[in-house]
Amino acid sequence: IHATAHAVCVVLAAFGYWVAAPISLAFTTSGGVLGALYLRKRATGASRLAATHISRWLIVSVYVAAGLCYATIITH
């Protein structure tokens, strides 16, 4: 799902919809965080993802940053 959304945002950004660029960054960053947590889970043999609540807050902060980028783009 992350890859599809990322691809759509990249295509939209290529066609001049510049608001898609920060959203694409948000998808990429959240996917990277989830991937890192999954690898940590696999390496330690844990039964669930460690620090899931921290990863949720990281993902939320990335989306907030994307929203702030959008607000900056449309006001300038």
From Swiss-Prot:
Cellular location(s): Membrane
Organism: Equine herpesvirus 4 (strain 1942)
Family: Belongs to the alphaherpesvirinae HHV-1 UL43 family.
Disulfide bonds: none
Main location: membrane
Signal peptide: none
Top-rank lineage group of the source organism: Viruses
The keyword Membrane is assigned to this record: yes
Sorted UniProt keywords: Membrane, Transmembrane, Transmembrane helix
Membrane topology annotation: Multi-pass membrane protein
Protein name per Swiss-Prot or TrEMBL: Membrane protein UL43 homolog
Coiled-coil intervals: none
A cellular-component GO term for this protein: membrane
